[in-house]
């Protein structure tokens, strides 16, 4: 009986070894140098600046992957797709038109089949389509540019400015994958200026330039020496006790110019959200934007993008607030906001270099052009990054123009 089991065992081992030998090419990186069969029945779905090529894979065990090769911008580009999929994407075409794409079947030994030539006809690429949607307008301290990007393509929108000596220089580049929106170029003098706006894609293709002439509106930083805190009955204007006792910390710390160490303004831990605080700017301003610095410490970044850092909040304005603290018609909503890490990370994600710069220099928020001129500001915190009951801020800096 033992001899029979021994013989059968040798037989099964021999079968397994033979099977492995038959498939050696599939497991050996150097594999076979025999070219595999071509892919079959290729069809095309054309897209803006790109195309998807679908195909049937050959019944060939020597096939490792499919390679697409095509020429654009006097360069040969290649795209590889494994044998686990039946399609691939070719992209980066500079203009609408017809292009030849060669499909190769590639073996485990990197032997290639004869090419199957497929014609693709990509639509107008996103960088050209977005160029046709650009609209500029003057705004405080610069210009505002609106764009539509329905494909959510990765693009750069550049702004150039004509200098006094007639030389054009780039003053801003806005990178986006958004479906559309606005971006602002700030820090410019309130003089009539020639600008150019163009679009660049990730392959370096440039659109033609939209030339415009705009006169940026005068903008200045609001005078913080005139700011005064208010103690409206329904507000959370009192600060957390340990700060109040040990460091004299209260709302006035929001405009003391100190952004790299305590004290800061932190509301009481016994409060609840949503909550609000109110202050008087001392003068009436047509506001354009503001910078918010949360609790930042050099090298440590404090509680920026965590703890009581406001996540979703609102900015309200008034010229004659009701002294009983009511949120009535004496207040107008200037805008709603969300604090977002430049990296797009969450509360538990490590801060990137961009996040750290935002922590140090503050987050910039735009006040809509149609917002009325106001003297009193009400900051309403709806929730925080750390889902706390309180909020904390180091500094608020507002910009705009005095309004008589």
Tell where the protein language model's regions lie, with residue ranges.
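C-terminal motif of bacterial Sec signal peptides marking the signal peptidase cleavage site
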Residues: 16-19
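Aromatic, loop-rich ligand-recognition surfaces of beta-strand-rich domains
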Residues: 258-329, 361-404
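Pro/Thr/Ser/Gly-rich low-complexity, intrinsically disordered linker/stalk tracts
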Residues: 21-60, 95, 112-152, 208-232, ...
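Disordered, acidic Ser/Thr/Pro-rich linker "stalks" and the adjacent N-terminal cap
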Residues: 214-284, 295-296, 300, 348-349, ...
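Preference for solvent-exposed, low-hydrophobicity sequence contexts
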Residues: 162-183, 198-245
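Beta-strand-rich modules
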Residues: 90-116, 181-217
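Recognizes extended acidic, P/S/T-rich segments that occur
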Residues: 57, 61-96, 160-190, 331-342, ...
